[in-house]
Regions:
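GST-like domain detector, emphasizing the conserved glutathione-binding G-site
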Residues: 1-133
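Cysteine-nucleophile amide-bond enzymes
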Residues: 3, 27, 138, 142, ...
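A structural signal for well-ordered alpha-helical segments within the folded catalytic domains
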Residues: 3-10, 50-53, 57, 83, ...
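Surface-exposed alpha-helical segments enriched in charged/polar residues
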Residues: 13, 90, 171-175, 251
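GST-like fold's C-terminal all-alpha helical module
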Residues: 96-216
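Short His-centered aromatic/hydrophobic patch
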Residues: 199-261
Length: 264
């Protein structure tokens, strides 16, 4: 599961972009590429973009002008930037890192079930290359140690700071939805901010979002819906998030907009 990959993939699906997806193991990509964020490769223009935000602006410049009718208007509205959306960009980028560190505190705890992390990393996903899956399974103890060190998971104060960071963003999202009448975070139409927010928080709602993640492409994620080893803290957080307006908004967005493109 890659938050930023889902953001880009979801936007491309809404825009009906004709693309081919190549999946890599979540942790092995650090070794192969030096990073885990998605790449957008346009062979026609020989372009390679390694940042999900910049990939969206590329699509805005190259793909949206080729769209027709209502879909073109929706596509332009989806990717249009404003002072408000750019302010959200900064908050959501911080949110992504905070969520990762906070969740890994439990998923990579000393007594954590390796099956959870391996599924989140794609270690049991048939669409991920076999060698990547084998590397993740065989190298799990080493990867776990490296991730614990990289995210400073022994630092209790940092763990609390991460939690406070993303709860503050959730409060902002609840307030924005109330201000906008419950439609979307930044206005009447869907924005890339809405997609980013939902993609970042979706993995923390596994009981409802996992079947809809990536439009249901990854069969190995299914056991995460009701995994017997899911940490209690993550289960409790999901329950609390589902009671929030922003949590209900995330579920609504996945149900209504994850499996269809804009209508032309």
């Amino acid at each position: 599961i890659n938050h930023f990959g889902e953001k880009l993939r979801w936007c491309m699906d809404l825009l009906a972009v004709d693309y081919e997806e190549s999946n890599v193991g979540g942790i092995t990509s650090i070794i192969l590429r030096g990073r885990t964020v998605p790449w957008l490769v346009d062979r026609l223009s020989c372009s390679l973009i390694g940042n999900s935000d910049e990939a969206l602006w590329y699509l805005f410049a190259v793909h949206v002008p080729t769209m027709q009718g209502d879909a073109a208007q929706q596509g332009a509205a989806l990717l249009r930037r404003s002072e408000e959306t750019m302010a959200w960009e900064e908050r959501l980028n911080a949110l992504g890192h905070a969520i990762q560190g906070w969740a890994y505190f439990y998923l990579l705890a000393t007594n954590a079930d390796p099956d959870l992390s391996l599924r989140y990393w794609g270690g049991k996903e048939p669409t991920v290359p076999l060698l990547h899956r084998l590397a993740q399974r065989c190298g799990y103890p080493a990867f776990k140690g490296l991730m614990r060190k990289a995210f400073a998971l022994d630092d209790e104060s940092l763990h609390q700071k991460r939690y406070d960071t993303f709860v503050a963003v959730l409060d902002d999202a609840d307030a924005a939805l109330e201000l906008k009448g419950g439609n979307h975070l930044t206005g009447e139409s869907i924005s890339y901010v809405d997609i980013s927010f939902c993609a970042l928080l979706g993995p923390l709602l596994p009981s409802t979002i996992i079947p809809l993640w990536a439009n249901g492409r990854f069969s190995s994620f299914a056991p995460l819906q009701d995994h017997p080893s899911m940490p209690t803290e993550l289960v409790d957080f999901e329950d609390a998030l589902q009671r929030r307006p922003c949590g209900q908004y995330i579920e609504k967005m996945f149900r209504e907009w994850r499996n269809r493109p804009f209508a032309s």
